[in-house]
Amino acid sequence: MAGRSLSRSTVARRGAAVRSFYAWAERTGRVGTDPSVRLGSPKVARSLPTVLAVTGAATLMETARELAVDGSPADLRAWACVELLYATGARVGELVSLDLQDVDLDARSLRVIGKGDRERVVPFGVPAADALRSWLEDGRPTPAGGSGTTAVFLGQRGQRWGQRQIREAVHRLAALAAVDDVAPHDLRHSAATHLLHGGSDLRTVQEVLGHSTLSTTQRYTHVSAERLRSSYQLAHPRA
């Protein structure tokens, strides 16, 4: 595989599949020995997630708010989407799945169903509450009926808004705000990193993001360390 110009991650995944197959074959008596033990496994460099600067995130949110001033349903919806993605660190699929009964505006919290059907309650702040309330009261259409009637985010025809539409809205807002191009998942990364920078502990960030293990959340400490090193090298006279 190494001679076919495949990426390290692809080679690693395929090697893992081969090892898994032969482990099963040996366990069930289909082969006498496991030839995959001789397979090497390349080290895969872990890429750091894309994270907006705090000022960049603020610019993105302010741009979304300013566009929504005209009361356009599309702009109100986009404003609510980016505010919630950044405020809660929700996955785009979790945002799409939100129903009206999952929202508590008074408590400023969302009930989110994450991976493995794990449920969590995530708080959000006043800016996200303002955006969401504006969308629900002034932008969200009232469909005559159908499967999308309880969805928080609806399209013009009353259907549940999809992940692709949310991604397009986020990319559009990033371009208009003249910040780094980001996807919804980058807002999740940004939320986690900014929480840690602000003094939140790893366990809290794990709960907010809905990670099943703390080790998944620890990647954001690497992001913080990388940012720290970058800032140090820029600022210190003897870096």
Label every model-predicted segment.
Residues 1-239:
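Conserved catalytic core of the tyrosine transesterase superfamily
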